[in-house]
Swiss-Prot record:
Organism from which the protein derives: Olivierus martensii (Manchurian scorpion)
Family: Belongs to the peptidase S1 family.
Molecular functions per Gene Ontology: serine-type endopeptidase activity; signaling receptor binding
Record flagged with keyword Secreted: yes
Tissues where this protein is expressed: Expressed by the venom gland.
One GO location term (cellular component): extracellular region
Purpose of the protein: Binds in a dose-dependent manner to the breast cancer cell line MCF-7.
Protein name (record): Serine proteinase-like BMK-CBP
Subcellular location: Secreted
Length: 40
């Protein structure tokens, strides 16, 4: 993201990051049990 800024911890509590050594992916909490991610 060009021109973006870092978010503070807790600023977007519905956002999720899945950060593994092989890849990183983002998601969004849609309930207390489920995370919605892109299919890639």
């Amino acid at each position: 993201i060009f021109g973006g800024t870092f978010a503070k911890n807790g600023e977007y509590p519905w956002m999720v990051v899945i950060d593994l050594p092989e890849f990183a992916c983002g998601g969004v909490l849609i309930s207390k049990k489920f995370v919605l991610t892109a299919a890639h």
